[in-house]
Curated annotation (Swiss-Prot):
Oligomer status and interactors: Homodimer.
Role: Involved in the gluconeogenesis. Catalyzes stereospecifically the conversion of dihydroxyacetone phosphate (DHAP) to D-glyceraldehyde-3-phosphate (G3P).
Catalysed reactions, semicolon-separated: D-glyceraldehyde 3-phosphate = dihydroxyacetone phosphate
InterPro entries registered for this protein in UniProt: Aldolase_TIM (IPR013785), TIM_sf (IPR035990), TrioseP_Isoase_bac/euk (IPR022896), Triosephosphate_isomerase (IPR000652)
Signal peptide residues on this chain, from the entry's feature table: none
Active site: 98, 170
Pfam family, one: TIM
Keyword set includes Cytoplasm: yes
Sequence positions that bind substrate: 13-15, 176, 216, 237-238
Protein name: Triosephosphate isomerase
Similarity remark: Belongs to the triosephosphate isomerase family.
Pathway: Carbohydrate biosynthesis; gluconeogenesis; Carbohydrate degradation; glycolysis; D-glyceraldehyde 3-phosphate from glycerone phosphate: step 1/1
E.C. numbers: 5.3.1.1
Amino acid sequence: MSPSHRPVVITGNWKMYKTVKEACTFAKALLPVVEVSPIQVWIAVPFTAIYPVKQEIRNSRLVIGAQNMNDASEGAFTGEIAGKMVKEAGASFVLLGHSERRHLYKEDNAFINRKVKKALEIGLTPVLCVGETFEERKSGETQQIIRTQIQECLAGLTAEDLKTLIIAYEPVWAIGNGQNAKPEGAQEIHQFCRKIIKEIFSEELAEQIVIQYGGSVNPSNAISLLKQPDIDGLLIGGASLSLETFVEIVNDGGSIFNLKAKLL
């Protein structure tokens, strides 16, 4: 599949920001932009905001998701939330394996793999996050780390399973600190991710799967990242909290999508 045939997906990850009122106000203000954009716009909101935001934007093209879920359907897991709960609240997708979950809460690939399987089982689109730390990058381990994360997090899945899964490459060293991978460097890793998918599954699936980039994305680097042939979207943290900034990035995404389409 040509890169221009893959959808462009811009995802905002609000992390632990925005009250229900703030989230609803933001989402409603974003709708005029989303409705006319040629790309897909997703937001991973706090758990408390999933249902009210979904009600606020009912029947719109804006896609709402969760930032995490447990691999169990239910049980005595204080403070946890099940995938079926966030889906019932209105989530269409879920972020899994985000670096903050891996490093702050010690989630490993096996646990993330179980979450991915559960998400697929209940009809949530998993956005699988992978990426290396500064130390791993410095020691030349980037590709091995990425390979291991993808292989172990997707273990036991079929090609059919992956048709609704997104991969997000987020170099840990570039998250939330103003640093970001150079577009060419990010492209190299995205291309490598497709190579792994080809080895495990098929060339067809490798060309179809959407791979996002995340890591200090902002209006000054969004276009240069999205111009890369294997970067199909962006996973945005801090820059997604400002309506003005997020709209600018969404509009940039639409421009690049249209540009790539003309090259067919």
